[in-house]
Design a protein with these regions (language model features):
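N-terminal glycine-rich "phosphate-gripper" loop used for MgATP/nucleotide binding
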Residues: 61-65, 72-74
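Short glycine-rich anion-binding loops that position phosphate/pyrophosphate groups of nucleotides
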Residues: 65-67, 90, 177-179
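Catalytic core of DAGKc-family lipid kinases
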Residues: 92-169
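Gly/Ser/Thr-rich active-site loops/lids in small-molecule metabolic enzymes
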Residues: 165-168, 172-209
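ATP/nucleoside-binding phosphotransfer catalytic cores, i.e., glycine-rich phosphate-binding loops
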Residues: 143, 148, 159-162, 211-288
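Gly/Ser-rich helix-loop-strand patches that form or flank binding pockets
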Residues: 70, 74-85, 90-92
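Short aromatic-centered micro-motifs
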Residues: 156, 178, 234
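ATP/NTP phosphate-donor binding region
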Residues: 1-58, 62, 98-114, 125-135
């Protein structure tokens, strides 16, 4: 078994933790298999991250949710399961804390885990002639205005039916996984991971009826600019972004790929949500 470790090598805490994790994987696999199958570790600091994944049987993300999303994008392309160790300030995708290292590795080596599948979004931007942007997202697609630009007027369609024109700063289209990310900050609903849905949440809608919509996962979501706008951007999972033309069409629908997350002790979602948000508040107060 070969494990690929992906992390931010510019963070000292991550580098130190990777060393401990590597030693634990090799030592525990040697002990549990009586030397018959020692697990191998590929450190992404020594390779390009996608190259590290090419030879791996599973990936481990070390860091926060941002690191996990980037690792997960590679895992989806390689059809690999991914496990997340949490080192950040708020982790709802990363199940395991850094203090759980040996216990987690032992359960992993012994095969005592399950694979949880999550849906993805397929995002396309069409300029009227061809697709100019095609990405997969685990959390969300965001269509938003530039920092200094005016209010945007966005037409929303679901399965070809016109829903409304939203005067707003943008619209977030998220999976159930992304419902606890940017969508939640914009006032969107919290959706349990087991429910495959698409959540549509306007950002700072300029009227009182700008509520979120929960659509079926099979729905086709389409966004167009009702009025020309100079600075509009589409972003996938917060890191893949491009400026779109005034007549462009943004389409979000269920992706063919699935994210496969390794779960050892499947957490109670609401307990994890409460614990993580409480930890974040405590850390913010301690920094003041």
């Amino acid at each position: 078994m070969t494990v690929g470790l992906l992390y931010n090598k510019n963070k000292k805490e991550s580098v130190h933790y990777v060393k401990l994790l590597t030693e634990a994987i090799v030592e525990i696999s040697r002990r549990e298999s009586a030397g018959r199958e020692i697990w191998h570790v590929i450190d992404s600091a020594d390779y390009r991250q996608d190259s590290a994944a090419a030879s791996a049987d599973l990936l481990i993300s070390i860091g926060g949710d941002g690191t996990f999303l980037k690792t997960a994008a590679i895992a989806i392309l390689r059809e690999l399961p991914v496990l997340g160790f949490h080192l950040g300030t708020l982790g709802l995708l990363t199940e395991f804390e850094k203090n759980d290292l040996e216990k987690t590795v032992l359960r992993l080596v012994k095969g005592e885990y399950v694979i949880e599948e999550r849906m993805t979004l397929r995002i396309t931007v069409n300029d009227g002639e061809k697709n100019v942007f095609e990405k997969s997202a685990i959390n969300d697609c965001v269509l938003s205005r530039g920092t200094l630009s005016k209010v945007a007027y966005i037409d929303l369609y679901i399965n070809g039916a016109f829903v409304d024109t939203y005067p707003c700063d943008g619209i977030i289209v998220s999976t159930q996984t992304g419902s606890t990310a940017y969508s939640l900050s914009a006032g969107g609903p919290i959706v349990e991971p087991g429910n495959d849905v698409i959540v549509i949440t306007p950002i700072c809608a300029h009227y009182t009826d700008g509520r979120s919509i929960i659509a079926r996962s099979t729905s086709k979501i389409e966004m167009r600019l009702c009025r020309p706008h100079r600075q509009m951007y589409v972003t996938a999972d917060g890191y893949a972004s491009m400026q779109i033309a005034p007549d462009a069409k943004v389409v979000c629908e269920r992706g063919a790929d699935k994210l496969r997350i390794i779960r050892i002790d499947p957490p109670n979602f609401y307990e994890a949500l409460r614990r993580k948000t409480s930890e974040r508040r405590a850390r913010i107060h301690n920094e003041e």
